[in-house]
Amino acid sequence: MAFQKEFFGLRDVKVDLSAGEGLDFDPSEVELTVYRTGADTDGNTIIKALAAVGGPKTNEALSVLLAFVTLGTDQDEYETRIKILKEIGFSVKEVPMAKDASSGIEAPLENVAALVKPETVYQVIRGVLYTCALFVKYNVEKMQKYIKNKLPALATSYGVPELEEFPTESSALKKLASCIRPGQRITNALYAFLLVEMARPETQQGARALAAMRINGTGMTMVGLFTQAAKNLGATPSDLLEDLCMRSLVDSARRIVRLMVQVSQAETIQARYAVMMSRMLNENYFKAYGLNDNSRISAILVAVNGHFSEDTIEALEGIKVSAEFADLARRIAIALIEKYDNASDGGEGASEIIKSAVRGSSGAFKGSRGKPQGRRQEASGEGDLDSEDDDDQDYSKYA
């Protein structure tokens, strides 16, 4: 097949971690915001701000909530949080919270606010902030699904049933999505809050449960898929890398390797979180690690692994590509299966399942198990940052 001429591997792709390239994570280049509460802040101000999230004053409302959860009136606690962020290496800017966060009659989280009690307000606001932070990574459509299908169960399990009332209306979610974007002050303040939360053992479990750690856009999912595919094919990882990496994917793969090496070399758990979150905290980092090319690698791996387990596609709902590339991915998968089947001469590493699938395919990938869906959606869930249509057309010419 013509597209096989475009395959080449990573053995000649040098990942020189000392070379710079502007891709290394440097926390000092990211300014995190920490909001302070005002001297006259009372419970009514907090509740009004909570109700206003998702409305026209979302930025102001979130600044009030973030100031509240950072305990800005407790000077010792406040200074401890600042110290944690600075020790990781971030630049920190202290900013007063907004004076007026009430959005009048437009209060998207009014139902949540109405259920809050004095003894639950802190946990409810933490849960709201964890949920809002996901808008950096997921688009509105995916957040609607998350809020409808997953948030209620998590909220109940962790004792904050008030979050079951989190709105799913597109207008409120679109407003949140427009405010919580890479490089925005409120976004950096959200992740400053999350980093401190995760640095504390007593809060780590709850933070993860409420999805603060859903950052698998860093490529960790692809690594798991790759390992599974190598095992299924009976291929050595180095050989599979050579077959899998098309010319236009190499830069993206290099970024993944660089990022994972930085994660593995981090000396503390806080620093590891900081590295993984780097693409959330700075617009330039976010675009540099926009791993849309890796969604295509993952689509190929899903096509291979789909021969073995129906769970492959169910566990990877976010990995979806254009119809053109989905077709190409299936043909690449067949080429890989045929190569390793023939190379083993029916011996070790040649699964009978693969043999049967290839014999019955007559050159086409048949069966729906593991088949990537045709509609396009980025692997990491970011909404419409960059169009990928041109890239897909470039790939399809190799079919």
Swiss-Prot record:
Lineage: superkingdom? Viruses
Give an example GO cellular component term for this record.
helical viral capsid
Cell location: Virion; Host cytoplasm
The signal peptide here is none
State what this protein does. Encapsidates the genome, protecting it from nucleases. If expressed without protein P it binds non-specifically RNA and therefore can bind it's own mRNA. Interaction with protein P abolishes any non-specific RNA binding, and prevents phosphorylation. The soluble N-P complex encapsidates specifically the genomic RNA, with protein N protecting the genome like a pearl necklace. The encapsidated genomic RNA is termed the nucleocapsid (NC) and serves as template for viral transcription and replication. Protein N binds protein P in the NC through a different interaction, and can be phosphorylated.
Subunit architecture: Homomultimerizes to form the nucleocapsid. Binds to viral genomic RNA.
Q: What is this protein called?
A: Nucleoprotein
Q: Which organism is it from?
A: Snakehead rhabdovirus
* Gene, per the UniProt record: N
